[in-house]
Structures are given as structure tokens and as C-alpha cells.
Design a protein with these regions (language model features):
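Short flexible linkers and secondary-structure junctions
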Residues: 24-145, 277, 281, 317-320
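Bacterial Sec-pathway N-terminal export signals of envelope proteins
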Residues: 21-67, 220-260, 312, 341, ...
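Sec/SRP-type N-terminal targeting helices
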Residues: 44-48, 61, 90, 104-132, ...
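Bacterial N-terminal signal peptides that target proteins for export
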Residues: 1-9
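Short segments within alpha-helical structural elements
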Residues: 193-220, 370-427
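Bacterial N-terminal signal peptides
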Residues: 9-18
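Small/polar, glycine/serine/threonine/aspartate-rich low-complexity segments that form flexible
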Residues: 69-102, 226-234, 267, 280-311, ...
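Periplasmic alpha-helical coiled-coil/stalk elements that build and connect Gram-negative outer-membrane
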Residues: 2, 134-246, 351-354, 358, ...
Length: 430
């Protein structure tokens, strides 16, 4: 009786927890994604990097530099001789100027620099998209994992209720002398095993909620419930997925952008072969005053302008070395793109195989779970009537529980594969 009371206590706690969860707000997957996108720290850091790249895109390479100078200097010279008293001669000097320097040609380097800044901005924006996709993938995976674990828990609750009913029935039959004490003890062992299993599964569900809440970064005290059903999208076509992956996969887009930056780096180095032409102009003012002489001063002022050209005719083959290295970097970026493309397309094929297999297995296991449920209902009735032993009933019970768990596992794997395919095809943020 003590074991029965213990199992009833466990069942009451779990049912109370289930009722509390039902009373909480249901958090949809879309709401969870929005919460994560708003609060995730890694995404905030990536967005700040994007703002830095935005600040770096300026017209500075095309614009002149303007500088201004000003100066005031006072000089005191003391003159003395044997025939006169010492005298102090003071001079005051004032000068000011403004200059403008403008590079008007540098082998088109300024245009390449600006274009490179824009490309780096595009890459930063692409990294934000990748971070968003990664976060959405994690949120979806954890969300559906909670659904699976909760369904595991529900099936464990059902199994515990059946084991409790079996034990009570076995105890009554034992008191009537219908069964032996050995069968009663076996029923008690199975009841205890199901009690332990349900407590372990309840801990698994709680841990899944904690991991999910950490991912949302919404505070561990956040209370919510989630939906209890996993729905697979209509079956996807592999040819369509291949085409979309090559065009829209964000990792491949980032690799293509990196290749373009390498090309621009090569263009910048090539610009070193050309002369640079600068235009400069300015205005200078200078005034020197002699206070000891009335109305005595010297003043100059005026404009200046001119052009200046610099051409590095020979640099000890440094320019040639830099161009050679830039070409190698460009080749490396092209090879890196091909490597990433090969890796991603290979992952696509593997995921699609897992996806199709997961759908097929899910259909099989769904049918098996329904058959197992029907068989369990029949077995329960036969057990109550005494035409089925406790050990035989336990086998039906385990078959039902295993069928439910296999169905949930297959459904979860198919859904995770579906999410992975949408990620590779660039569809996850649509």
C-alpha cells in the first residue's frame, strides 16, 4: 500500500504540474523566434559590427583635406653697451594659414576603396543574416524538442496509470488467491520502474524548458507553455532545393562576397603602379611688428596653388610581390568558395535523404502506434478478465510505449531535417 500511495503522489504532482502549465500563456514558435531575435547577445554583437561597417562607408577617399594653422610669437632682445643703459627690443609675430590638399588621381584606387567598403558592408549584413538563421534554427530545434519530451512525459503518465491499475488488480487477485505472490511482486517492480521513469522524464522536460529559456534570454523566471504538436510541411523537392541553395544560401553568398573583396584588394595593389596626382592650394598671412619703432611692421599675405605628381618607378620589386600575393589570395578565395559549395551541397543531399527517410519512418511508426494502442486496450480488457497474465500485459504495455516513443523520435528527426533543408536553401527567414 505504501508503494501505491507513493505512485499516487507522483501522479498527483505531475497532473498538478500539467494543469499549471495549461494555465500559463502558450508561447507560439513565431513568438519565441521574435523573443530570441530581440534579446540574443550574439546577435546584438553582430548587429553592432554591422553598424561599424555602415560607419566605414564614406566619401572620404574622394574628398580633399583642409587644414588650418595659427601662430603668435613674442621675442624680447636685451641690448646693452658700456656707453648706454640696457634696452629691450620686443618683436611680435603673427601668422595664420589655411591649406587644401586634394588627390585627384591615384590609379582609380579611391574608387576601389569606396567599392570595397560597400562590399564589406554587404558582408557584415550577410553575417547578420547568418546569425539570425543560426538562432532561428536553434530556437526551432529546442522548441520541437520540448514538444517531443512533453509527449514522452504524457506517454509515461499513461504507462504509470496502467501499471498502477495492474498492481491494484494484482493485489486484489492475490488476496483472493487467484495469483501467486511472485506475480504481485513483479507488478510492484514494474510500477516502481514506471515511477522512476516518469520522474526522470519530468526532469528532462524541465531541463529542456531551462535550455530554451536561456536561448531566448528572457529570464529563467519566465513562465510559459508551448504547443504540443509537430506538423511536417509538404514534402520538398530536391531539384528545387539544389537550385535555391546555390542561389540563396547565405554562407555561399558570403563566400562570393569574400571573393569580390579579394579582387578589390588586387585592384588596390595594382593601383600602386600608377602615378598619384594631387592638387593643393592655400592662403598664408604673416605679420611682424616692432613696437619700439612707430608704425614699423612687415606683413606678407597671399594665395598659392599647384599640382604635384608622384610616381614610384622602382620599389625594389615590392609592388610586384604585393600583386603576386594578392593574386594568390584571390585564388584562395575562389577555392574556398568551391570548397564551401561542395560541402553545403553534400550536406543538402545527406539531409534530404534523412528527411525522406524520416517522413517514411514517421508514417510507419504512426501506424504502429495506433495498432499498439488498440492492442493495449484489448490486452487491458483481457487482463481484467483473467485471460492474460501480468507479464503478457506488461509486454503489450511496453510495445505501446516503445511505439509512441519511436513515432515521436521519427517525427522529431524529420522535422529537424526539414529545418536544416530550409536553412541550406535560404528559406528559413522567409
Amino acid at each position: 500500500m505504501r508503494k501505491i500511495r507513493h505512485s499516487l503522489t507522483i501522479l498527483f504532482i505531475l497532473l498538478a504540474a500539467s494543469s499549471a502549465m495549461e494555465a500559463q500563456k502558450t508561447l507560439t514558435l513565431d513568438e519565441a523566434i521574435m523573443e530570441a531575435l530581440e534579446n540574443n547577445y550574439s546577435l546584438k554583437i553582430t548587429r553592432n559590427d554591422l553598424k561599424i561597417s555602415e560607419n566605414n562607408v564614406t566619401l572620404a577617399p574622394f574628398l580633399p583635406t583642409v587644414t588650418g594653422t595659427g601662430r603668435q610669437q613674442q621675442t624680447d632682445n636685451t641690448t646693452s653697451s658700456s656707453s648706454s643703459d640696457p634696452s629691450v627690443n620686443r618683436t611680435n609675430q603673427y601668422s595664420a594659414g589655411a591649406s587644401l590638399n586634394w588627390r585627384i588621381f591615384d590609379g582609380l584606387g579611391m574608387f576601389t576603396t569606396y567599392s570595397r567598403q560597400e562590399q564589406l558592408l554587404d558582408m557584415s549584413n550577410q553575417r547578420v543574416k547568418i546569425e539570425v538563421e543560426t538562432l532561428i534554427t536553434r530556437v526551432c530545434t529546442e522548441y520541437y524538442n520540448i514538444i517531443v519530451q512533453q509527449n514522452y512525459l504524457e506517454s509515461s503518465v499513461t504507462s504509470l496509470a496502467l501499471s498502477r491499475s495492474r498492481y491494484e488488480n494484482a493485489e486484489e487477485k492475490y488476496l483472493l488467491g487467484v495469483i501467486s505472490g511472485l506475480e504481485l511482486q513483479q507488478a510492484k517492480i514494474d510500477l516502481n520502474a514506471d515511477s522512476s521513469e516518469i520522474l526522470s522524464q519530468y526532469e528532462t522536460v524541465n531541463n529542456a524548458y531551462i535550455r530554451f529559456t536561456k536561448l531566448l534570454n528572457a529570464g529563467l523566471q519566465m513562465t510559459f507553455n508551448i504547443q504540443d504538436t509537430i506538423i511536417l510541411a509538404p514534402e520538398m523537392n530536391i531539384d528545387s532545393l539544389r537550385g535555391r541553395t546555390v542561389r540563396y544560401n547565405n554562407q555561399l553568398i558570403l563566400a562570393r562576397q569574400g571573393e569580390m573583396v579579394s579582387q578589390q584588394d588586387l585592384d588596390l595593389v595594382r593601383a600602386l603602379r600608377y602615378p598619384t596626382v594631387n592638387f593643393s592650394t592655400g592662403y598664408n598671412y604673416n605679420r611682424l611688428q616692432y613696437p619700439w619703432e612707430a608704425n614699423s611692421y612687415n606683413q606678407t599675405n597671399g594665395f598659392n596653388w599647384g599640382f604635384n605628381m608622384t610616381w614610384n618607378i622602382f620599389t625594389g620589386f615590392e609592388t610586384k610581390r604585393k600583386i603576386s600575393n594578392a593574386r594568390l589570395e584571390l585564388e584562395n578565395s575562389r577555392l574556398a568558395y568551391q570548397d564551401i559549395e561542395n560541402e553545403i551541397l553534400g550536406d543538402l543531399e545527406l539531409l534530404y535523404n534523412a528527411y525522406i527517410n524520416g517522413i517514411t519512418v514517421t508514417n510507419f511508426e504512426t501506424e504502429s502506434a495506433e495498432v499498439a494502442r488498440t492492442s493495449l486496450e484489448i490486452a487491458m480488457e483481457r487482463y481484467r478478465l483473467g485471460s492474460l497474465s501480468g507479464l503478457e500485459f506488461r509486454e503489450y504495455q511496453n510495445n505501446y510505449l516503445n511505439a509512441i516513443n519511436r513515432k515521436l523520435t521519427a517525427l522529431y528527426r524529420a522535422k529537424v531535417s526539414e529545418i536544416g533543408l530550409r536553412l541550406l536553401a535560404g528559406e528559413l527567414t522567409e
